[in-house]
Amino acid sequence: IHHIAVVAYLSGTTITGKFDTAPSNTNARTTWKEQVFSSRHGYARSVAFHDQRLVFGGSKDLPNHLFMSKVGEFFNFDVGTGLDDESIQIQIAENQVSEIKAVESFRHLSIFTSEAELYVPTSENRPLTPSTISVKRQTSYGSSGVNPVDFDGALVYLTKSKGAVREFVFSDLSQAYNSDAISLLSQEMIGTIVDMSAQREAPDQAEAYLYTVNSDGNMAVM
């Protein structure tokens, strides 16, 4: 296998480039591969560590794909033969293509897209492997580009419409995730949110606070 650094784009079928090592055969090749992430194809929109894997979510050309490293080897994305600890690469296939906005490691690997909120179910008897992975849609509000925040036992996120802040929380009763609005009583405090952050409790402070920063510089506290 040879790697080529592209120097110039000439046409849809022709480029110039530099080999990392001299090729043994200079005949024309009809089979080749490109890097998943690059300045041409875009880079991952979100990243997280989950179950000893480095997880990348979405890119410009692959907006609904998940890439997970080999267990314990964060820079190894070789899918190999599909062994339990090898890299996992999947597409979230639904009725409509949605962009992954964020991936978060919480109780499960949670995925926030432009159209829905999903999670990857796992358990002690069902670990995360290439052969067992599945993605389950839970709610359908869609997420904005603001990163979700771990707050008070839930993942708090801003909806796609930017009209509500909701908490993605697991219900032991229904064995599913809910997305209840937590901004209903303070709707007038929500402007155009551009960032969120949580202040956790401390030895001298029992309360925890969620701060939302608006585009005009104002800040709301929940």
Spans of model-derived segments:
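Ser/Thr/Gly-rich low-complexity blocks that favor extended beta-strand/coil architectures
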Residues: 1-13
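Beta-propeller and closely related beta-pinwheel folds
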Residues: 26-206, 222
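RNase H-like, metal-dependent nuclease domains and their acidic two-metal-ion catalytic environment used
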Residues: 213
